[in-house]
Amino acid sequence: METRGPGLAVRAESRRLVGIGPRAPPGRVGLQPSGRLDRRGGAGTMGYKDNDGEEEEREGGAAGPRGSRLPPITGGASELAKRKVKKKKRKKKTKGSGKGDDKHQSQSLKSQPLSSSFHDILSPCKERGPKPEHRQSKVEKKHLPSDSSTVSLPDFAEIENLANRINESLRWDGILADPEAEKERIRIYKLNRRKRYRCLALKGFHPDPEALKGFHPDPDALKGFHPDPEALKGFHPDPEALKGFHPDPEALKGFHPDPEALKGIHPDPEALKGIHPDPEALKGFHPDPEALKGFHPDPEALKGFHTDPEALKGFHIDPEALKGFHPDPKALKGFHPDPKALKGFHTDPEALKGFHPDPKALKGFHPDPEALKGFHPDPEALKGFHPDPEALKGFHTDPNAEEAPENLPYLSDKDGSSSHRQPTSKAECPNLCFEGNLTPKLLHSDLAPTLLE
């Protein structure tokens, strides 16, 4: 060895030392970055200390520090052993002390309250928002249920006080001394007030709110007086009572004091004046003055009260008086076109009593009630005297008429020649009555020869 020179010896020694140094498994030598880090000047030793400690614990401390992670060692094996022991002691201390310190820190954080400076830091954030107010409101809400039982009693007292004040507002200066009478007065006042409100509500039943003014003193009487035929249902207790009162449901539209409103019912706007506010106005239209009170519950009662203005023409002195009371305009045609025609038609003023409640009403039908006394003492005698209303046409248009061809159809002509043959039967001459009803004027001397033959 000495012959080779000192340079060779150093190389051999270095080889020996290098072979001694790494005690780690040979498979890991090439994977570790120790060669690179050693060339950079040992800078990698600081970054790998923790990993070294973990690996040493896993290996149980027998193998010692891995040579691949340590800088190149120039000393002996004894120095390496000493360093290894020191490192183990240090790492055990640091690990144990770290765990203990962590435990103590966690306990101290749990037990130690926040410092005043930390509270000062947090307090401005809390003051910015409305959180303290919410807390106060929550606290107040928590206290409310406990006080509700005490608040409810004053509420009832306040309600009672308000009710008393409302009743007091209905009083005047002279309050009734008797409390019962005062209560009754207040009750009546409230009823009247309700009626007033109802009257205002009923104003909408007609397009013209003034239309039904004064039609009836009771504002409830015309409830539903409307063009709809169903609207009159409440007008009478019997909903059938007004059925057929008029075929046209528009006919009673606005039955009121405006003369234009009744145009279709009567040509003369004066004719129905007084049909309403006065309940006495229709008294003479029926033998029973109560019959038309409230448009009668019997629907048959007004059957003949109809719309044709020609129906009863001539039934009265004023031909316009009963216009529109019958559906058939031919019904009384020719009953007598002359209102004087029935003057004294009967001697008994009781005979026509049923036509009018006032027995004085027909007084003018004849100036002398004795004039035709013998004409028919029995008032039933003229019942059905002629079912045909045309039969009495011209029977006596003028009660004072003398013998005339139209009145004496079977008399001889004025020159004495008999131009008319004798009637042989009633059928040939329906106008002649053979039952003893011939008037003295028909028993003329000119008539005797023809009758005796």
Curated annotation (Swiss-Prot):
Its main location: nucleus. It comes from Homo sapiens (Human). Participates in nucleolar liquid-liquid phase separation (LLPS) through its N-terminal intrinsically disordered region (IDR). May be involved in ATE1-mediated N-terminal arginylation. Sequence repeats lie at residues 201-210, 211-220, 221-230, 231-240, 241-250, 251-260, 261-270, 271-280, 281-290, 291-300, 301-310, 311-320, 321-330, 331-340, 341-350, 351-360, 361-370, 371-380, 381-390, 391-400. The keyword Glycoprotein does not apply. Residues 82-103 are annotated as: Lysine-rich domain. The gene is LIAT1. InterPro entries: LIAT1. Keywords: Cytoplasm, Nucleus, Repeat. Post-translationally modified by JMJD6 lysyl-hydroxylase activity at its Lys-rich domain, which inhibits its self-association and nucleolar localization. This is Protein LIAT1. Residues 201-400 are annotated as: 20 X 10 AA approximate tandem repeat of A-L-K-G-F-H-P-D-P-E. It is found in: Nucleus, Nucleolus; Cytoplasm. LIAT1 proteins of some primates, from macaques to humans, contain tandem repeats of a 10-residue sequence, whereas LIAT1 proteins of other mammals contain a single copy of this motif. Quantities of these repeats are, in general, different in LIAT1 of different primates. For example, there are 1, 4, 13, 13, 17, and 17 repeats in the gibbon, gorilla, orangutan, bonobo, neanderthal, and human LIAT1, respectively. The N-terminal intrinsically disordered region (IDR) facilitates its liquid-liquid phase separation (LLPS) in the nucleolus. In the IDR, the lysine-rich domain mediates self-association and targeting to the nucleolus. The keyword Repeat applies. GO terms for cellular component: cytoplasm; nucleolus. One of its GO terms (biological process) is protein arginylation. Residues 145-197 are annotated as: Interaction with ATE1.
